[in-house]
């Protein structure tokens, strides 16, 4: 039972492999009507690029969750973008530079231009899927971060939002 009073069996079944082992019986019976997805996968954000392939997301799709295909497409695009040197700053957020194991200049976070592109594609994905993928509160925090990191006009985020969604953000000046 979770802290919120819900049954954890379903969540457990999502991260279970299709062949349950003996040790899982301690947790309890897995509902066979639930979709067992995969073990040994990431736990966390669906768009995490720390692993090359999101097996959990793929298995949801393989088991009939077709509505998740656009999320996989976006995530795979993010993985490709992350590997694109031009999309990344050569400095880390703390201003330092480093060399990787091959002796090449390492990469820091996405450039502001790359982040603008990512936001634009994410907002388009929201429209395509009907899922809320980013909240107004998160957008406001990003807007402030972008101002601190080089968007001195403080227009980039609100302009992208209006361009894609066709509506204004609550804090946007008219």
Regions found by a protein language model. Give the residues of each.
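Extended, charged low-complexity segments
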Residues: 145-174
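Nucleotide-activated chemistry modules centered on ATP-dependent adenylation/adenylyltransferase
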Residues: 1-141, 164, 171-174
